[in-house]
Structure formats: C-alpha cells, structure tokens
C-alpha cells in the first residue's frame, strides 16, 4: 500500500536525475554500512556473481543488462540490511533507476564501458571491505561510488524517460540465494 501511495505522489512530480542521486548519495552509504554485520557467505557469493555480470571485462551481456545487474548489487546489500524503511527506500530508488534512466544514442560505447568498469571496481572494493567487516570503509567506498555514478550518468547525458509507474509487485528482489540466513 505504501508503494502505491509513493507511486501516486511521484507520478505527479518532476523527478530529475539530480533528485534521485542526491537521495541515493545519502542513503546508499548508510544502507551498505548497516548491511555489513548481516552479510552471509551466500550474500557474498551473490555480490561476486553480480560483479562478474556487470563488469564489461568479464561479461558478455549487453550494456543494458550489465547496468541492471549493477543495480542488483545494491539490492543484494539492501536485502541484508535489517532496517526495513531504509531497505524499502533504496529498493524504490533502484527500481526508478532501472525503469526511468536512459542514455542517448550518442553516448559512445567506450563511455558505457568505462562506467561499467568503474562500477565493478567499486563493487569489488566494497565486497573486500565488507568481508573484512569494516563497515566504515564500506560507507566511505559507497559514498565515493555514488558520487562517481552521479557524475558518470551526467557525463553520459543520462535522462529520465517517462514517469514512475509501479504496482505492489514491481519492486524487484535480488535473485534468491540458497542457504540465506539472517544474522
């Protein structure tokens, strides 16, 4: 029901990429740091799989699939965070990114590749810090990642296309991982 209220509200708002990334830069570092003590080995495996799928040096997927997998990395972290409101807020933003942000056809493939490589490296560094249970390092790395992502999306002339239309089943969950147990 809350999702439907958000949908109704946001449908009539002019939401920009700057709006999305301003909020994302505040929430994602805290979400990731809060997830650190709760990450299981299955979560780490899912995070590493996500990295291999979104890294253009390792993946044979098309660029759109790689970008969606990049966002899935953040959903995996969200699923491990015990704060339901923070988790919901970040998942909503991630779904907006999946559905609404598009790039112009004039953006060179090399730019997309560079963006993907940078994201994959940030993700590897975040996983390494999370494995060391260094929540503060994860927070710092995620903050840097969000700043880099925001500037990359602007540089690549990303724009909002359409309006957010969600229903109760729209928020995508990360792929289920066998043996997932809450810490």
Regions of interest found by a model, annotated:
Residues 2, 14, 66-67, 116:
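Short linear sequence motifs
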Residues 106-114:
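Short helix-coil transition/hinge motifs at the ends and kinks of transmembrane helices
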Residues 135-183:
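C-terminal effector-binding regulatory domain of bacterial HTH transcription factors
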Residues 20-104, 119-128, 137-152, 156:
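Conserved amphipathic alpha-helical segments that form helical-bundle/coiled-coil interaction surfaces
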Residues 1-27, 33, 37, 161-163, ...:
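Short linear motifs at protein or domain termini
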Residues 13-16, 59, 111:
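General structural signal for secondary-structure boundaries
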């Amino acid at each position: 029901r809350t999702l439907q209220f958000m949908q109704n509200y946001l449908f009539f708002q002019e939401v920009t990429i700057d709006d999305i990334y301003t909020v994302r830069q505040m929430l994602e570092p805290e979400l990731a740091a809060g997830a650190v003590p709760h990450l299981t080995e299955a979560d780490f495996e899912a995070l590493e799989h996500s990295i291999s799928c979104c890294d253009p040096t390792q993946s044979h997927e098309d660029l759109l699939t790689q970008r969606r997998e990049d966002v899935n990395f953040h959903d995996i972290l969200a699923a491990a965070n015990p704060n339901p409101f923070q988790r919901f807020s970040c998942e909503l933003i991630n779904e907006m990114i999946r559905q609404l942000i598009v790039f112009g056809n004039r953006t060179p493939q090399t730019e997309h590749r560079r963006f993907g490589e940078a994201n994959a490296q940030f993700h590897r560094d975040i996983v390494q810090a999370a494995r060391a249970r260094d929540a503060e390092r994860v927070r710092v790395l995620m903050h840097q990642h969000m700043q880099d992502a925001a500037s990359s999306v602007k540089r690549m002339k990303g724009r909002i296309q359409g309006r957010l239309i969600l229903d109760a089943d729209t928020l995508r969950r990360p792929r289920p991982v066998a043996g997932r147990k809450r810490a």
